[in-house]
Amino acid sequence: MNVPWENAHGGALYCLIRGDEFSAWHRLLFQRPGCAESVLACRHFLDGSPVARCSYPEEYHPCVISRIALLCDSVGWTADVERISAWLNGLDRETYELVFAAIEVLEEEGPALGCPLVDTVRGSRHKNMKELRPGSQGRSEVRILFAFDPARQAIMLAAGNKAGRWTQWYDEKIKAADEMFAEHLAQFEDTKPKRRKRKKG
């Protein structure tokens, strides 16, 4: 994860982190032993960009970048299965276990996970739309369309068995997944801190 650094002076380092990364980084930092005392203050700039002021000694400044970047990279990914919960509840036990085994791997690996478990979807208007391909029972071909959002969540959007309906299945599911993810992103933007306009002095 690329963490842009602003400046350092007076024995403290100031780091500027994008809003979608800040909450996860801030939460992780305070959960790590020995890190709580390193953070003196956290606040938001007027434009909504969060800044963290860290009290690492001056001599550690060259190391802080890699240390904080490592903390950011170690923040886990999570899967949001709310939109496919009805489908999940209708699965037989073996298929259910195979699906959740695949989801657990996805949460561990994040966007780095590739074939054969994850593949890119063609025809979606979202460049990061992918499909999860868990193991299947018999002749079934289970697929789950998902996309990662800025909050490090894999949003599970549409799922089903595409066996025997290869092209038709994608035509139907991708369209639905596109709409759901667009709606999710819009809601995500609405919850972000609004940029304040500076008053003319």
UniProtKB/Swiss-Prot annotation:
Print the keywords alphabetically.
Answer: Toxin-antitoxin system
UniProt function note: Putative toxic component of a type II toxin-antitoxin (TA) system. Its cognate antitoxin would be HigA2.
Which ranges of the sequence are coiled-coil? none
Q: Does the keyword Aminoacyl-tRNA synthetase apply?
A: no
Q: What is this protein called?
A: Putative toxin HigB2
**Induction annotation:** Induced in persister cells in response to D-cycloserine.
Q: Which domain of life is it from?
A: Bacteria
Similarity comment: family membership = Belongs to the mycobacterial HigB family.
Cleaved signal peptide residues: none
Asked if the keyword Lipoprotein belongs to this entry, the reply reads no
